[in-house]
């Protein structure tokens, strides 16, 4: 049903999209139709297509009252833009339709579950001068194009939060269905002492929900508010993914501020007990937040994330007509105690001619025939020997601009550095990552698009993601070593 606010957003979106050329967008990373985007939402399979919704403020390239944007794809790579599907207009979501998820119902409808942020009438303003709001969980149903909010929203309110929890910070439902016939949802909730916990709810019909238990909690460790939870099993291991705010650093494992971590363990579906065994970073780069996953019809767990970070997102480059993009969708597996991430295999269908260099000795800055470009899929295998001190890849480069991927062989530290990439703000521009060789090698699969680099380290056992704003003419790639390096390179331009 096209309400007045929704219709206004759709008309604005269609008009402003005409002002953005394809040359201004990345080739294969999702962007919003116009305006601002952040968290991926409603990542699901419905009517023979993959659906991706997203947090969306169409009216500017800054964060604002959240709508839901919408795209579909047959292969995770080429996406079709559909009209915005939700606008903040009801009493329970007039301050924003916040993040949520989606699932197909048995009757064929597409069910969306999201957080409504509503202004509390008569409550005045908070310490920041903003209206006092509360967060509740809401439903909408649709046919893949148009969606209608459930007439009895909200379906879970602050009254359904167990003792000790906040009614203000209660959001980001992730829905799925179990073999027992129930829909389940994990929802994050801040506790009165400023920590976070992940609550589990269930419903027989998708609309009437009951509280079940606490899945896990931060307990004054691993940050404060755990945003955007995801909960699933992969390769026999139960995974809880959260995006903590106010994270404290721990060596090179966890970095300060907003992060994404995954907790591994076991889960008893009868007692709904999750026993945590380990905690690891999900991505160790600069720009990665709020991932959401889905299960494909062929049984793959596929994840996508907002390719940005909240501290950096406040600094929007001058002249851009939209802001925010998503990572390439990643296949997730569990092996040797870690989540393994790789770009979805469908990306290989877009590869052009193969360029191969094997066992190349590098001692000084070197260019190699056929190795340059900005839209590519390149794997570099570095032999780590006693003769190697450090090795550097310089990409998206010319005389003025460059981004760097460097490896210190003695410290076993990989560094990504975009300080010369053209992102001209005093924000985080580099990150150090502990990376040990595997069988004497460090392997880097590098995905480049017009405005980003995604690095899959040692067959995806670690990843590092960063956004760059470098003129497209800067397309040189060079290799340099201190000491002596031996590398092999396989590179494909990506053709669209």
What are these regions (language model features)?
Residues 1-172, 177-221, 235-284, 307-357, ...:
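Beta-rich carbohydrate-recognition and catalytic domains
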Residues 10-16, 264-496:
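Beta-rich accessory regions
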């Amino acid at each position: 049903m096209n309400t007045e606010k929704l219709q206004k957003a759709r008309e604005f979106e269609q008009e402003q999209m005409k002002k953005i050329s394809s040359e201004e967008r990345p080739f294969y990373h999702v962007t919003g139709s116009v305006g601002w985007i952040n968290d991926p939402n409603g990542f699901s399979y419905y009517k023979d297509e993959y659906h991706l919704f997203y947090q969306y403020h169409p009216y500017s390239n800054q964060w604002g009252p959240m709508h839901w944007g919408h795209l579909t794809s047959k292969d995770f790579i080429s996406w079709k833009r559909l009209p915005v599907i939700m606008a903040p207009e009801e009493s329970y979501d007039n301050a924003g339709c916040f993040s949520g998820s989606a699932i197909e119902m048995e009757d064929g409808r597409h069910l969306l579950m999201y957080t409504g942020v509503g202004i509390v009438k008569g409550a005045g303003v908070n310490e920041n001068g903003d209206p006092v709001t509360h967060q509740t969980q809401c439903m909408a149903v649709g046919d893949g194009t148009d969606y209608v909010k459930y007439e009895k929203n909200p379906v879970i309110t602050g009254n359904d939060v167990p003792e000790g929890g906040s009614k203000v910070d209660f959001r980001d439902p992730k829905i799925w269905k179990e073999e027992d016939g129930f829909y389940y949802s994990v929802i994050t909730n801040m506790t009165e002492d400023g920590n976070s916990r992940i609550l589990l709810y269930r419903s027989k019909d998708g609309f009437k929900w009951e509280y079940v238990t606490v899945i896990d909690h931060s307990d004054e460790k691993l940050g404060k508010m755990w945003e955007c939870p995801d909960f699933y099993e992969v390769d026999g291991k139960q995974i809880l993914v959260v995006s903590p705010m106010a994270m404290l650093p721990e060596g090179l494992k966890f970095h300060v501020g907003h992060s994404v971590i995954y907790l591994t363990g076991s889960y008893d579906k009868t007692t709904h007990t999750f026993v945590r065994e380990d905690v690891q970073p999900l991505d160790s780069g600069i720009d990665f937040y709020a991932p959401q996953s889905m299960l494909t019809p062929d049984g793959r767990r596929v994840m996508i994330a907002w390719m940005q970070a909240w501290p950096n997102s406040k600094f929007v480059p001058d002249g851009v007509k939209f802001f925010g993009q998503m990572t390439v969708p990643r296949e997730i597996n569990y092996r040797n105690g870690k989540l393994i991430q790789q770009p979805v295999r469908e990306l290989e269908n877009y590869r052009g001619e193969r360029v191969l260099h094997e066992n190349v000795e590098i001692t000084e800055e070197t260019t190699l025939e056929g190795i340059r470009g900005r839209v590519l899929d390149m794997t570099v295998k570095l032999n780590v020997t006693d003769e190697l001190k450090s090795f550097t890849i310089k990409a998206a480069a010319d005389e003025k601009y460059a981004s760097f991927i460097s490896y210190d062989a003695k410290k076993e530290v990989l560094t990504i550095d975009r300080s010369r990439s053209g992102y001209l703000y005093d924000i985080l521009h580099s990150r150090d990552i502990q990376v040990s060789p595997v069988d004497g090698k460090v392997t880097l699969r590098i995905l480049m698009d017009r405005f980003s680099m995604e690095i899959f380290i040692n067959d995806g056992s670690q990843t590092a993601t960063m956004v760059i704003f470098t003129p497209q003419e800067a397309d040189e790639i060079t290799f340099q070593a201190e000491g002596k390096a031996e590398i092999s390179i396989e590179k494909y331009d990506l053709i669209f």
